[in-house]
């Protein structure tokens, strides 16, 4: 088991709230709920839930200078109701910096704070108030945002982000993030996000996830449970707490634990071959065979370790005896012919790193892979891969563009696509899982080679490709978290920790 600090959604309501929805679906959930629960009641309940979260969190003191950034719509109304609720709980340093209300609910909440000990800050004093705040609450914009933030709100967000001493809370999602908002736009940088009903998928883009902070707390502002359960899901929010090391049968022997082949390494990048092959072995593979080219063979023989058999690539004439194959780590260029031969074995194949470049070239020339396939690009590799095959960079656009594009690639290639970042996304045939990791210690050279070896091992043990990818990511992050508790570490230490 992993400790309770592993990144699992904190849900003070129900276990089905680990589903993710789009901003449009969140708006529909809100509208549907309002047919049964008045909108003002939902807003009041949201404020109460957030106040309870603050009280339980223990990070905010009663006399802290707490500044609320209040937008013109219902997110601003939530912020005002939240401020009033905290006033009722005995918090004394409450201030609000407000834009002109445009929604009726925001106007009601603006009037409602008049008789509470909440100080209004004029716009000309905004900079001073933001700089001196000990807690900043972002209630500027919510799920209805469809364009980059500009004007005074943009200035306030930039100023708030610059206040490194303040504890920052985002209501529903950090302002500046949305399905259709370019990820290069400014966004509020929260330490914790209180999101309503269900978490939003746009919060899990590689470029936006850090803005949500280390903790995302899912709260229910009295949405009827059946509406939450029935809400269409974009994907599932997974936890490394579910990591499982595959058990071995008491009568297991080396062949029953999976025989895997690895095509990796070159004269310039010999370390990738060692890391991926050792990771496959330590993850549980019974037989690991590393195929190296002529240039890297001498290094591979001495560095791969006694547990790995090393062969010349020319000896790989019969791949039928292997249960799964990994191709690409440290390969270099010009490996298209070899990759095609590997893919035509119809064995489960993991394609990583330079193998993705070779695969893109094959597909552009008309080749279509057939057989179980797992692709493991990092952000830069997916950007180049999508540009080559789809004619557009799906990573540096909007959160929706990434979800649409990665699903399109998975469908087009019949593959599981694993996007490696602070949030791992695992995608196949409309199924999408998000593994929220945020473990910077694991962001080290060779970490991806280790992950590829783990997934290879699980494929070799007959796990279905999607499950092999998901469980591989969980194990990778779990071990990384355990090592990270003791400080920074190398990929070799990560592989040995398996």
Regions found by a protein language model. Name each.
Residues 84-163, 298-311, 315-316:
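N-terminal small/polar loop signature for handling phosphorylated ligands or for N-terminal nucleophile
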Residues 4-9:
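Low-acidity, Ser/Thr- and Arg-rich intrinsically disordered low-complexity segments
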Residues 134-135, 140-232:
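Internal gly/pro-rich beta-alpha loop/helix module
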Residues 75, 102, 176:
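Conserved Rossmann-like nucleotide-cofactor binding loop
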Residues 12-98, 106, 135, 192, ...:
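Small-residue (G/A/S/T)-rich helix-start motifs and N-terminal tracts that mark the onset
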């Amino acid at each position: 088991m992993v400790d309770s600090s592993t990144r699992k959604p904190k849900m003070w309501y129900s276990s089905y709230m680990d589903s993710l929805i789009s901003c449009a679906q969140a708006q529909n959930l809100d509208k549907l709920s309002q047919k049964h629960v008045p909108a003002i009641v939902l807003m009041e309940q949201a404020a109460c839930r957030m106040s309870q979260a603050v009280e339980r969190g223990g990070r905010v003191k009663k006399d802290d200078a707490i500044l609320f950034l209040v937008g013109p719509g219902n997110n601003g109304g939530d912020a005002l109701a939240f401020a009033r609720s905290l006033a009722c709980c005995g918090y004394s340093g409450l201030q609000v910096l407000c834009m002109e209300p445009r929604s009726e609910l925001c106007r009601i909440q603006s009037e409602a704070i008049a008789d509470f000990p909440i100080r209004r800050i004029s716009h000309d004093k905004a900079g001073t108030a933001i700089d001196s705040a000990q807690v900043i609450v972002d209630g500027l914009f919510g799920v209805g945002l469809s364009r980059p933030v500009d004007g005074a709100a943009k200035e306030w967000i930039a100023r708030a982000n610059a206040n490194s001493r303040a504890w920052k809370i985002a209501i529903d999602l950090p302002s500046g993030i949305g399905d259709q908002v370019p990820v290069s736009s400014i966004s509020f940088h929260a330490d914790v996000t209180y999101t309503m009903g269900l978490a939003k998928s746009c919060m899990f883009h590689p470029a936006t996830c850090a803005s949500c902070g280390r903790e995302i707390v899912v709260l229910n502002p009295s949405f009827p449970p059946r509406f939450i359960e029935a809400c269409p899901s974009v994907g599932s929010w997974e936890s490394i707490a579910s990591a499982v090391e595959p058990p071995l049968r008491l009568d297991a022997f080396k062949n029953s634990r999976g025989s895997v082949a690895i095509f990796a390494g070159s004269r310039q990048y010999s370390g990738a071959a060692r890391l991926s092959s050792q990771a496959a072995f330590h993850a549980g593979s019974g037989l690991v065979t590393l195929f190296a080219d002529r240039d890297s063979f001498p290094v591979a023989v001495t560095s791969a370790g006694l547990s790995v058999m090393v062969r010349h690539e020319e000896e790989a004439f019969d791949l039928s005896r292997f249960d799964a194959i990994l191709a690409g780590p440290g390969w270099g260029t010009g490996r298209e012919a070899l990759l095609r031969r590997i893919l035509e074995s119809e064995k489960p194949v993991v394609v990583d790193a330079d193998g993705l470049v070779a695969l893109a070239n094959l597909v552009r020339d008309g080749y279509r892979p057939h057989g179980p396939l797992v692709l493991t690009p990092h952000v830069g590799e997916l950007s180049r891969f999508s540009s080559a095959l789809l004619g557009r960079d799906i990573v540096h656009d909007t959160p929706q563009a990434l979800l649409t594009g990665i699903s399109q690639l998975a469908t087009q290639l019949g593959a599981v696509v694993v996007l490696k970042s602070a949030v791992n996304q695992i995608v196949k045939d409309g199924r999408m899982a998000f593994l929220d990791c945020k473990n910077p210690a694991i962001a080290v050279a060779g970490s991806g080679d280790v992950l590829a070896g783990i997934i290879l091992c699980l494929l070799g043990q007959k796990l279905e490709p999607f499950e092999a990818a998901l469980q591989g990511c969980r194990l990778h992050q779990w071990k990384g978290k355990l090592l990270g508790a003791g400080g920074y570490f190398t990929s070799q230490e990560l592989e040995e920790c398996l």
